[in-house]
Swiss-Prot record:
<feature type="binding site">
    <location>
        <begin position="50"/>
        <end position="51"/>
    </location>
    <ligand>
        <name>phosphate</name>
    </ligand>
</feature>
<keyword id="KW-0479">Metal-binding</keyword>
<feature type="binding site">
    <location>
        <position position="18"/>
    </location>
    <ligand>
        <name>Mg(2+)</name>
    </ligand>
</feature>
<keyword id="KW-0378">Hydrolase</keyword>
<dbReference type="GO" id="GO:0005829">
    <property type="term" value="C:cytosol"/>
</dbReference>
<dbReference type="InterPro" id="IPR036412">
    <property type="entry name" value="HAD-like_sf"/>
</dbReference>
<dbReference type="GO" id="GO:0043726">
    <property type="term" value="F:5-amino-6-(5-phosphoribitylamino)uracil phosphatase activity"/>
</dbReference>
<feature type="binding site">
    <location>
        <position position="203"/>
    </location>
    <ligand>
        <name>phosphate</name>
    </ligand>
</feature>
<protein>
    <recommendedName>
        <fullName>5-amino-6-(5-phospho-D-ribitylamino)uracil phosphatase YcsE</fullName>
        <ecNumber>3.1.3.104</ecNumber>
    </recommendedName>
</protein>
<dbReference type="GO" id="GO:0016791">
    <property type="term" value="F:phosphatase activity"/>
</dbReference>
<dbReference type="GO" id="GO:0009231">
    <property type="term" value="P:riboflavin biosynthetic process"/>
</dbReference>
<feature type="binding site">
    <location>
        <position position="17"/>
    </location>
    <ligand>
        <name>phosphate</name>
    </ligand>
</feature>
<dbReference type="InterPro" id="IPR006379">
    <property type="entry name" value="HAD-SF_hydro_IIB"/>
</dbReference>
<feature type="binding site">
    <location>
        <position position="16"/>
    </location>
    <ligand>
        <name>Mg(2+)</name>
    </ligand>
</feature>
<keyword id="KW-0460">Magnesium</keyword>
<feature type="binding site">
    <location>
        <position position="200"/>
    </location>
    <ligand>
        <name>Mg(2+)</name>
    </ligand>
</feature>
<dbReference type="Pfam" id="PF08282">
    <property type="entry name" value="Hydrolase_3"/>
</dbReference>
Length: 249
């Protein structure tokens, strides 16, 4: 690790939720809560940056009583501290139709996020009646997953990541956590150099790369660890709190 504490001036901590802030019971540990509160008390902004939609993360986000922004659906949406929408970028319905056809071709598990619902199992008849944020495939079989990935990559208008080794997450091209964070830092009056970003999956790589300090969880996918400046403990060992204490407090 080449970065030292004296090399960075952290004004904002960006934290992924699943596999990062949350333990395997989907809870925020007392240690993580305490470190986040101490960082905010010190004047450092804390921003949750998640692949989840607002409806699936709001309760957890509210419990932290953060003073800044919230990034959801891998950067498709930015919310202020009162959960008012600041910005939203949608997936084109043609792309949703293509991915739904691909899902049916391979008979995979899926989920798809609109602005007011997460679809699982069922799917709307009229795709154009909805505003789409993200489409996800969950595929245990490596061969099928790679085949789906290959077909998706033919379309150059998609941002393709994952939030676990067995899934694929798709947003509109250019929509990622880093792009959303850059907009947040601009609103707050500093740059990505002043950000510490923490995560565990491919949908965290962009923000980990572009942040002044990129932190991978101990349980992160290998490619995420290779990208990071620093590797903390796992999500079940208060890795978030330990990184905050090491770099900020």
């Amino acid at each position: 690790m080449s970065v030292q504490r004296e090399d960075v001036d952290i004004k904002l901590i960006a934290i992924d939720m699943d596999g990062t802030l949350l333990n395997d019971e989907q809870l925020i540990s007392d240690e993580n809560r305490k470190a986040i509160r101490e960082a905010e008390d010190k004047g450092v902004y804390v921003v949750i940056s998640t692949g989840r939609t607002l409806m699936t993360c709001r309760e957890l986000a509210e419990s932290l009583k953060l003073s800044s922004f919230l990034i959801t659906a891998n950067g498709s949406e930015i919310w202020d501290s009162n959960f008012n929408l600041v910005e939203r970028k949608l997936l084109h319905t043609d792309h949703i139709q293509m991915m739904w056809d691909l899902r049916n071709k391979h008979n995979t598990n899926f989920w798809a996020s609109t602005v007011n619902k997460v679809w699982r199992g069922e799917f709307p008849e009229n795709i154009t009646d909805h505003e789409w944020l993200k489409f996800g495939f969950d595929i245990e079989d490596d061969d099928i997953r790679n085949e789906v990935l290959e077909e998706l990559r033919k379309n150059k208008e998609l941002e393709i990541t994952n939030s676990s080794p067995t899934n694929i997450e798709v947003n509109a091209l250019g929509i990622n956590k880093a792009a959303a964070l850059a907009k947040v830092t601009e609103k707050l009056g500093f740059t990505m150099e002043n950000v510490m970003a923490m995560g565990d999956s491919l949908n965290d790589i962009a923000m980990i790369k572009e942040a002044g300090l990129g932190v991978a969880m101990g349980n992160a996918q290998d490619i995420v660890k290779e990208t990071a400046d620093y590797i903390t403990d796992t999500n079940i060992e208060d890795g978030v709190a330990k990184a905050i204490r090491h770099w900020v407090l």
